[in-house]
Regions:
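Domain-level signal for soluble alpha/beta catalytic cores
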Residues: 1-193, 208-793
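A cross-taxon signal for low-complexity, glycine/charged-rich
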Residues: 197, 202-207
Length: 793
């Protein structure tokens, strides 16, 4: 009989219960035990949902209070030494210190860092994208001295929880090669260094280079110990996630798989090697030959490899087919799925497993709460719970015939037919505009050097101009005002007055702090993508379709179901009002077409490039309206531009061609004196710098503080021609950076980028921070800018 399972399940809960519990814990409103109780309740509920859907195993090890990679850092005993843990701190406290950093009161010394016995500020672990998704993981830090040991009982406790509830258990681990790949080599501290800095040194300042793959021999015994423990606890199967098999791996990493998995196989554990997100290509045959009990392949992203996997995987091994899309919300086409599965089922019915393509972490929990969606559109969708139901339907259709699930199949087919024929999906006017787009619609009128001179004459900004990325703290009062307006409890005029008052507060605070280019603070915006999607045709919004971005941060991606257009101006009123309150330049704040695309659930019935260009034209219209309203600086955020890169380098150029063109189309309809900014975060750009330069933004701001300006070196080596604002402090941590710390970062930046082209700004928007820490950090940032204006020629 075919087995069905899931690679993972959403953690936050249907009502974001984990988010609210985490934030209460961080505010000191509940105890650690209270948070653990919420975790137990959510795990029990999610396991019950899996069993109710007919899954043969529940998955254990996918739950995390912040991030599953951070769970592994503790499980494997490799918490970075720079945090200075003495061994007495509670495990959960150490976990959150790694994730969020720790503030301190000790003064800074001449080294430019805060440190000392009083608990210096401890910057959080770097955070970056999980492959090409919108989920963020915490980056492990490795040095040659990094050791590993089994240091947490959490995984085993959760397996015991599930078994005590009567569930058959499949555990999931990030595989050893992927765990090492996800980390970074960090600097060794020179023993003679007089000042023990709280963060890693950049290369060249005391670092002894090494390859983290060299740590594999120290790591494997701990994995073996974990597998032995799980087997002894009655866990029959362990899913080993090795998605790096879909990457362009160096030869040494490929070669390491065979030896590593022979070591792991010696434990006697049944291992399911799980791959997803990309084609295995040359790694497929090797994956089929590894000494594991089964292999999972992503048949949604890579349907062409399914038959190869079925042919090459030995008949006695399990083939797990990711046949339901774990990353998007559209209902599965049962006829296409069954057509793909039947040849495989005929070959290996007893050793065929069905699953989502990847963990369901990337989709909302359930459609049950979506009472606001019209029934036609709702019928086109499937969230995590519904996707489990689709697996059950496919299992029974294969094993017992379609008649056994005739009702379910009929409903799925009717929904698909409705979507294909619905007039709401296609807009002839959008098609006409795309067809008539001029060839030069993606080019500014003049080159950057000409524009820069015009803009400098217009704005007369000081060197190292200080600004922010866009959003300011979203207080409980702001959120309550928006919620009351959405519920119809307050009228439109009252709401507008309240938002204007918040904008006025933000403008006043920025002027008092001494910022040079201001923003309106975005109090009216719930999310940088959702806000725009709500005002664009072709989008629909869920009531409770939340997915985890990082930690407690959840986003509610819009669903792009049809052609995109802009019925009316979206931001002009708020930005123009903010500009009326100050003589300083006010930035218009927009989200770029690629980011809107990447952070939405995108229609799958046309190429993503076509949808991106539709969005670009809508943003272009908004840029033109802002310019007409007198807004001279317009920021078009594209934090997701690198996230969209295919995982295989051979496919990069095609993606970058349409992605950068979409940005240029959105930004190029303005005069030379209008300054276009863009912002990118969580990104490493060195391998795509020509394409970043080709976007031709007048100013780019990027996240660099967590990497100690490491990301900026590539811009300097490339001689990046335009202006750049490297983030000088990490907004994801409540820690307030010292002035000297930011001065040091700016001095490092000025060593690789011409000082006249540098801006001063935080890493990202300040929406998730509180006002006291925001004002303190920005005051220090402005002072840092003042100092470097005086010290750097």
């Amino acid at each position: 009989m075919t087995t069905i399972h899931t690679l993972g399940f959403p953690r936050m809960g249907a009502q974001r219960e984990l988010k609210f519990a985490l934030e209460k814990r961080w505010r000191g409103e509940i105890s650690a035990d209270g948070l653990e109780a919420v975790g137990r309740e959510l795990r029990a509920r999610h396991w019950a949902l899996q069993r109710e859907a007919g899954l043969d195993f529940v998955t254990v090890g996918d739950f995390a209070f912040y991030d599953h990679v951070a769970n592994h850092i503790q499980l494997l005993g490799c918490e970075p030494a720079r945090f200075g843990f003495a061994g007495q701190e509670p495990e959960l406290a150490r976990y959150f210190t790694m994730a969020r950093g720790a503030a301190g009161e000790a003064p800074a010394c001449g080294c430019g860092q805060i440190h000392g016995a009083d608990a210096s500020g401890k910057p959080a672990l770097e955070m970056t994208k999980w492959f090409d998704t919108n989920y963020h993981y915490l980056v492990p830090e490795f040095t040659p001295e990094t050791g590993f040991h089994l240091a947490s009982e959490r995984l085993f406790d959760e397996a015991a929880e599930a078994r005590a509830l009567g569930h058959p258990v499949k555990a999931v681990l990030v595989g050893p090669l992927t765990f090492l790949w996800l980390g970074k080599e960090k600097a060794e501290r020179l023993a003679a260094h007089a000042c023990p800095l709280p963060g890693p040194l950049p290369r060249g300042e005391g670092e002894i280079p090494f390859d983290r793959l060299a740590l594999l021999e120290k790591l494997l015994p701990v994995y073996c110990e974990i597998l032995v423990r799980l087997k002894g606890a009655g866990v029959e199967w362990v899913q080993m996630d090795e998605p790096i098999l879909g990457l362009d791996l160096p030869a040494a990493w490929k070669k390491s798989f065979e030896g590593a998995y022979w070591r792991l196989a010696s434990t006697g554990a049944k291992l399911l090697l799980a791959t997803y997100f990309a084609a295995l290509e040359e790694n497929l045959r090797m994956a089929c030959q590894l000494p594991v009990a089964g292999l999972h392949v992503d048949a949604v992203r890579v349907p062409q490899e399914l038959i190869g996997a079925a042919d090459w995987l030995p008949a006695h091994k399990v083939l797990s087919v990711g046949i339901v899309d774990g990353r998007n919300v559209w209902r599965t086409d049962p006829d296409a799925a069954l057509a793909a599965l039947r040849p495989v089922y005929e070959k290996r019915a007893g050793n065929l497993w069905l699953a989502p393509s990847c963990s369901l972490l990337h989709v909302p929990v359930s459609l049950e709460a979506e009472t606001g969606l019209d029934e036609e559109l709702k019928s086109w969708l499937a969230f995590a719970v519904e996707k489990l139901g689709e697996l059950s339907m496919l299992k029974h259709a294969l094993a017992e015939g379609e008649a056994s699930v005739a009702v379910e199949l009929a409903a799925a087919r009717a929904a698909l037919a409705s979507r294909r024929s619905s007039p709401r999906v296609r807009n002839p006017r959008v098609a006409e505009r795309l067809a008539g787009l001029p060839a030069d619609a993606d080019r500014r009128a003049s080159p950057f050097a000409v524009r820069q001179a015009v803009q400098r004459a217009r704005f007369n900004l000081p060197r190292f101009p200080a600004t922010t990325i866009g959003s300011f703290p979203q207080t409980a009062e702001i959120r309550a005002a928006r919620a009351a307006f959405r519920r119809g409890e307050t009228g439109e005029e009252e709401y507008r007055c309240r938002m204007r008052a918040e904008i006025a507060v933000a403008v006043k605070k920025q002027e008092e702090l001494g910022l040079d280019v201001l923003v309106h603070g975005e109090p009216e915006r719930n999310d940088m993508v959702e806000y725009f999607g709500e005002q664009l045709a072709g989008f629909v919004f869920t009531r409770n379709g939340w997915v985890q971005s990082y930690g407690s941060r959840c986003v509610k991606p819009p669903v792009i179901y049809g052609d995109v257009s802009r019925p009316a101006a979206m931001t002009v009123e708020w930005t123009a009002y903010a500009q009326s309150l100050t003589a300083r330049p006010m930035k218009g704040m927009l989200t770029g077409p690629v980011t809107i695309l990447q952070w939405s659930f995108v229609r799958d019935d046309q190429p993503r490039a076509d949808t991106a260009l539709q969005i670009a034209l809508a943003i272009r219209d908004e840029v033109a309206d802002l310019e007409r309203a007198g807004i001279g600086i317009i920021q078009i955020d594209e934090p997701a531009i690198r996230e969209g890169l295919p995982l295989r380098r051979a496919q990069w150029q095609a993606y970058l061609a349409w992605a950068t063109r979409a940005f240029r189309v959105s930004a190029s309809g303005v005069a030379d004196g209008t300054q276009i900014h863009t912002h990118m975060c969580y990104s490493e750009f060195n391998d795509i710098l020509p394409e970043i330069a080709a976007m031709d933004a007048d100013v780019i701001t990027i996240e660099t503080s967590r990497s100690d300006m490491e990301l900026l070196r590539g811009f300097g080596d490339f001689n990046y021609p335009n202006e750049i604002g490297p983030g000088v402090y990490d907004i994801h941590s409540p820690r307030v950076p010292a002035v000297d710390e930011m001065v040091r970062l700016l001095e490092k930046a000025a060593a690789v980028i011409p000082a006249g082209n540098l801006w001063v700004n935080p890493d990202c928007g300040l929406k998730t921070r509180g006002w006291p820490e925001t004002e303190a950090a920005l005051a220090n940032m402005v002072e840092a800018a003042r100092r470097v204006r005086m010290s750097i020629v």
